Design a protein with these regions (language model features):
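Amphipathic alpha-helical segments typified by the pilin-like N-terminal helix
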Residues: 1-17
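Short, well-structured segments within or immediately adjacent to enzyme catalytic domains
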Residues: 15-170
Length: 170
């Protein structure tokens, strides 16, 4: 029991550290790009162009996006994370679909997503406007009037993770 508790605590610390590393990468990207936030596209544009902060779309199926590390290590934030795919995942997340387990998979490559209000959502946010009337889309670092009240990354539940664009429908 003591070892299990220590392991759980270590996984939590590693998960928080990964979120911090992604946050730092996100800030550095903006600093190198005239304060513009990294793109944060939805499913269709991610699949079509693969030019967003993370280039994979997670599913419960056997699609290559679930395991192909290139979709992470070649994405827009990759050079800011030393192309380390591990920072995109909470180490405690071992959830797989029955189909994935039957194929012998040990894990999927990502469990973290980005707030849909942060970055250009591409076709999701035409003209830089939020897809939700009355809500702000943050495109540059200077757009945040109260940055302490905004989350950027979160460890998303395996049942809902797909693209890198996390939204709670207002």
């Amino acid at each position: 029991p003591a070892l299990a508790k220590a392991k759980t605590k270590a996984q939590g610390i590693a998960c928080m550290s990964n979120g911090k590393q992604l946050g730092l990468a996100w800030i550095l990207y903006a600093g190198d790009n005239e304060e513009r936030l990294v793109d944060n596209h939805g499913i269709d544009q991610t699949m079509g162009q693969r030019r967003t902060w993370v280039n994979n779309v997670m599913t419960w199926g056997l699609e290559p996006d679930n395991t192909n590390l290139n979709f992470i290590t070649e994405a827009k934030l990759a050079s800011y994370t030393a192309k380390s795919a591990g920072v995109y995942k909470c180490p405690a997340d071992k959830v797989l679909s029955p189909q994935q387990r039957a194929r012998g998979w040990s894990q999927r490559v990502r469990s973290l997503s980005m707030n849909a209000a942060c970055g250009d959502g591409g076709t999701l946010t035409p003209n830089g406007q939020s897809p939700f009337p009355g809500y702000k889309q943050f495109l540059r670092m200077g757009d945040f009037s109260s940055p302490a009240n905004i989350f950027v990354f979160l460890d998303e539940h395996p049942d809902s993770i797909n693209d890198g664009w996390f939204v709670n429908n207002p």
